[in-house]
């Protein structure tokens, strides 16, 4: 409230600062014309926005910070709620020079107002004579660019990857190859291009040989002249005197020559692969077609040719080159022979075989010489290898003999060493046994001498005792008086007193033992008489009182569980009866696992009905064997062993017999 009251005076006082900062504000405003979002953000969070009215100018803050002054000065003119401060060139009726300076504020007001406040107080309304300038039109909304371009880019990339993957998979799968080449545009061309690249990569010299193969010279033959009236006519030509290409003549000589040349080749040439025969037949067929095409059809008259006269072949016959025969059984030579025969076959199929006959003949001779040289080298190598093997065998035999000799020497040395060590050990043992025997003899002699000395000492003592007895006897006989008789009586009385005291102790012990036995019988009676367990603490106190400080009785009483004599324990017959009931329940649960459910309990209950009771068995860890042995031990009265047998149970069986085992242990401790 205090700031709002002081705001008018502060607004008038800041006109001078506004006038000084006018050019700077204009420059900042022009530099920030394109930042509409920043002005919106500032206008949305502008403090005291409700107090700013249209038509009022907002002055810059008095904060000395450059950032605050810049933020308040960069407000745009196109905001409807925020107006820029007036400049000296404004059309307002009130000029900045005509505004009077405000009076100085009082010291109290200056002290109450903080000079660094960043809040823009509202300015009092100013009267304007002219209408406010219209706001500039808003900039056009930004179009969402990039979505269609991004979609198109992703579509092109996806299509390219899918197309490349389809081409690659077409090379791997025949079914997909058919589908891809049939339904995908330009799929067949792409696959064929990749297959051609793969073929060129595998066989780089295939196309070079095809391209560099010389073309056979074509025989154009004579010039063909077609008469003017030799065309197609509606009238069938007459045979009389006419020219027929099926008759014997010059045009048939090429066919006869080709047939004879083919027959000669089939007779002289060896067997070739089917592929080469096919190539030759195709070549022959082509030549026949060419010869047929070269047949001149003229009406010129020539001398008749006799049928008996031998005809000159149109194409001279080519002598074929004989292939190489198999020289040796070596695989390498046979492979080379196959390669040379293949070359000969290819040359025979070509028309230039006569040109290469001499080089091939020389090559065959060189190849035969090479085969003989290889055979000779192999024989020499085989002989050298045999000799080397024989030498190796001899060396091996010599080394083996030397090794056996060394082994025998080492064995002999080891045997001699072992024998020497054995003799040394035997001597050591004999010496040690001699020492032991000598020591034992010395000890035996010492013991015998000591025994003799002891016997002599005992004899001396016995002789002294006899001497004293004899002296005493003689003295007593000599006295023979009343003193000797009194001493005898005194000794007899003392012996009687001793006997009396001993008998009194024996009688007292007998009485105590009898009372203790009666108390123990009372405890047994309390345990065995009643049909229901009852406390026997009184009987136990009587036994403890009669026993006194007897450690055995006190230890036995301390070993009894306090619950047993405070609440009572069942008798032996009750334990046996209860065992029979517990045994039935244990048999029912004998087939249950540890994590059994309701179905397992029901199954075990039904199976226990059809189980047979076993006889007494000394072995076996199953439930039935343990129950049988326990029942036998209870009938014999061996409660301790019966409890140990029942303690060997596991799982639900042990859980069901837990209470019976506790009573059994308490009864065993009490008895």
Swiss-Prot record:
Q: Which residues lie on this side of the membrane: Mitochondrial matrix?
A: 39-150
InterPro entries in the record: MIC60 (IPR019133)
Which positions are tagged coiled coil? 360-455
Q: Which Pfam families match?
A: Mitofilin
Q: Which residues lie on this side of the membrane: Mitochondrial intermembrane?
A: 172-671
- Keyword tRNA-binding in annotation: no
Keyword Transcription assigned? no
Q: Where are the compositionally biased (Basic and acidic residues) regions?
A: 258-293
Segments traversing the membrane: 151-171
Give the record's keywords alphabetically. Answer: Coiled coil, Membrane, Mitochondrion, Mitochondrion inner membrane, Transit peptide, Transmembrane, Transmembrane helix
Q: Name one GO cellular component term.
A: MICOS complex
Q: Where in the cell is it found?
A: Mitochondrion inner membrane
Question: Bias regions of kind Pro residues — which residues?
Answer: 121-141
Q: How does it sit in the membrane?
A: Single-pass membrane protein
Q: Residues annotated as region Disordered?
A: 1-54, 70-144, 210-316
Q: How does it assemble?
A: Component of the mitochondrial contact site and cristae organizing system (MICOS) complex.
> Briefly, what is this protein's role?
Component of the MICOS complex, a large protein complex of the mitochondrial inner membrane that plays crucial roles in the maintenance of crista junctions, inner membrane architecture, and formation of contact sites to the outer membrane. Plays a role in keeping cristae membranes connected to the inner boundary membrane. Also promotes protein import via the mitochondrial intermembrane space assembly (MIA) pathway.
Family that this chain belongs to: Belongs to the MICOS complex subunit Mic60 family.
Q: What is this protein's name?
A: MICOS complex subunit MIC60
């Amino acid at each position: 409230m205090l700031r709002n009251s002081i705001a008018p005076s502060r607004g008038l006082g800041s006109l001078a600062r506004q006038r000084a900062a006018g050019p700077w504000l204009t420059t900042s405003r022009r530099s920030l014309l394109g930042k509409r979002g920043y002005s919106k953000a500032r206008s949305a969070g502008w403090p005291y926005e409700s107090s700013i009215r249209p038509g009022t100018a907002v002055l810059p803050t008095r904060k000395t910070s450059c950032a605050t002054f810049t933020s308040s000065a960069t407000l745009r003119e196109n905001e409807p709620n925020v107006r820029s401060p007036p400049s000296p060139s404004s059309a307002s009726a009130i000029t900045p020079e005509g505004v009077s300076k405000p009076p100085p504020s009082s010291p109290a007001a200056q002290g109450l107002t903080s000079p660094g406040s960043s809040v823009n107080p509202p300015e009092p309304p100013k009267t304007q004579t002219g209408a406010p300038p219209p706001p500039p039109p808003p900039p056009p909304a930004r179009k969402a660019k990039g979505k269609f371009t991004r979609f198109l880019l992703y579509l092109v990339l996806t299509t390219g990857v899918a197309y490349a993957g389809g081409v690659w998979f077409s090379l791997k799968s025949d079914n997909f190859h058919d589908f891809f080449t049939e339904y995908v545009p330009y799929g067949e061309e792409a696959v064929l291009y990749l297959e051609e690249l793969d073929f060129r990569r595998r066989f780089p010299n295939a196309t070079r040989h095809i391209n560099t193969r010389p073309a056979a010279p074509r025989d154009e033959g004579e010039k063909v002249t077609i008469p003017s009236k030799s065309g197609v006519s509606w009238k069938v030509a007459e045979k009389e005197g006419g020219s027929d290409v099926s008759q014997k003549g010059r045009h048939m000589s090429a066919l006869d020559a080709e047939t004879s040349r083919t027959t000669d080749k089939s007779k002289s040439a060896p067997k070739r692969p089917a592929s080469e025969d096919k190539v030759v037949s195709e070549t022959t067929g082509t030549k026949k077609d060419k010869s047929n095409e070269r047949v001149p059809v003229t009406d010129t008259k020539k001398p008749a040719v006799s049928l008996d006269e031998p005809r000159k072949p149109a194409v001279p016959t080519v002598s074929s080159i004989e292939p190489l025969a198999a020289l040796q059984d070596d695989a390498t030579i046979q492979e080379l022979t196959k390669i040379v025969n293949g070359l000969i076959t290819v040359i025979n199929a070509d028309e230039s075989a006569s040109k290469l006959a001499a080089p091939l003949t020389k090559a065959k001779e060189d190849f035969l010489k090479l085969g003989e040289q290889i055979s000779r080298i192999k024989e020499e190598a085989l002989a050298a290898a045999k000799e080397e093997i024989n030498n190796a065998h001899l060396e091996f035999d010599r080394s083996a003999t030397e090794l056996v000799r060394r082994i025998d020497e080492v064995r002999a040395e080891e045997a001699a060493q072992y024998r020497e060590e054995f003799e040394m050990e035997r001597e050591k043992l004999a010496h040690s046994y001699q020492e032991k025997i000598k020591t034992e003899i010395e000890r035996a002699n010492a013991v015998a001498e000591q025994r003799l000395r002891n016997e002599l000492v005992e004899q001396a003592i016995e002789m002294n005792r006899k001497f004293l007895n004899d002296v005493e006897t003689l003295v007593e006989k000599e006295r023979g008086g009343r003193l000797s008789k009194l001493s005898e009586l005194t000794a007899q009385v003392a012996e009687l007193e001793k006997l009396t005291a001993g008998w009194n102790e024996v009688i007292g012990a007998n009485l105590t033992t009898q009372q203790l036995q009666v108390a123990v019988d009372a405890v047994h009676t309390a345990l065995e008489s009643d049909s229901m367990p009852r406390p026997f603490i009184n009987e136990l106190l009587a036994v403890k009182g009669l026993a006194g400080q007897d450690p055995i009785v006190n230890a036995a009483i301390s070993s009894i569980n306090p619950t047993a004599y405070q609440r009572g324990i069942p008798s032996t017959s009750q334990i046996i009866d209860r065992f029979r009931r517990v045994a039935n329940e244990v048999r029912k649960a004998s087939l249950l696992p540890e994590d059994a459910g309701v179905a397992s309990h029901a199954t075990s209950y039904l199976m226990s009905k059809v189980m047979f009771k076993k006889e007494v068995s000394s072995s076996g860890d199953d439930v039935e064997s343990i129950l049988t042995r326990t029942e036998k031990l209870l009938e014999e009265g061996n409660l301790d062993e019966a409890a140990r047998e029942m303690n060997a149970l596991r799982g639900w069986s042990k859980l069901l017999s837990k209470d019976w085992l506790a009573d059994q242990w308490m009864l065993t401790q009490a008895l």
